[in-house]
Amino acid sequence: MTAREKLIVGLDVPTVQQAEDIVSKIGDEVLFYKIGYQLVFAGGLEFARDLVQSGKKVFLDMKLLDIDNTVASGVENIARMGMSMLTLHAYPKAMRAAVKAAEGSGLCLLGVTVLTSMDDSDLVEAGYASDARSLVLRRAEQAREAGMGGIVCSAEESTAVREILGPDLAVVTPGIRPAGADLGDQKRVMTPYDAIKAGSSHLVVARPIVRAEDPKAAARAILDDMLRASFPANQ
């Protein structure tokens, strides 16, 4: 897998026009894009289809969670759209229903473990008795047992998660920041280089690229950092 296949640019912008502008500026530098609630509710599903038709890959970040039948119905529809990845919260019954619904489609289902904007104190406030690391590892095991394609977690847990999931399942990591970058609302973060070294298979990067004066150059710098981690002899 090349660095271009591992980097996912998060199109966390309010309008399709802004998303189209970013994709145009980045050009062929990036292959993979993430689309979430904000853009979906502004007409982003049609835009996602357009990206797929143009040869790009789309990670639909919907974080689904509902009764089994509703999750399965949603996954079936999304699988027909040609998306490459889809998120749902890593609850066992929902994951099992989603896996069955996506069977044979090629859609990679990802279990969301603990948001990278949350730390142990946030989990306590939300009523969880577990710390972030323990909860991530438990949900990673449940995702593997359910037959999911991988999980979403902080790079801080990537090494331990990789031991649970093995070499083939996806470990998708948000909260990626180049050295010295503003952390924003993220709490459990890592640089692109360190995240790849830790065992992450895909990195999701939004603000450091989409808010850059030159998004293409910003993406190129992150890709270079990822390449250094993958091929250290070329440094």
Curated annotation (Swiss-Prot):
Classification via PROSITE patterns: OMPDECASE
GO biological process, one term: 'de novo' pyrimidine nucleobase biosynthetic process
Positions contributing to substrate binding: 12, 34, 61-70, 116, 177, 186, 207
A GO CC annotation given for this chain: cytosol
Gene Ontology molecular function terms on file: orotidine-5'-phosphate decarboxylase activity
Positions of disulphide bridges: none
Keyword list, A-Z: Decarboxylase, Lyase, Pyrimidine biosynthesis
Enzyme Commission no: 4.1.1.23
Active site: K63 (proton donor)
Pathway: Pyrimidine metabolism; UMP biosynthesis via de novo pathway; UMP from orotate: step 2/2
Pfam families attached to this UniProt entry: OMPdecase (PF00215)
Reactions that this protein is recorded to catalyse: orotidine 5'-phosphate + H(+) = UMP + CO2
Subunit structure: Homodimer.
General function of this protein: Catalyzes the decarboxylation of orotidine 5'-monophosphate (OMP) to uridine 5'-monophosphate (UMP).
Cross-referenced HAMAP family: OMPdecase_type1_B (MF_01200_B)
Family under the similarity heading: Belongs to the OMP decarboxylase family. Type 1 subfamily.
Protein name as it appears in the record: Orotidine 5'-phosphate decarboxylase
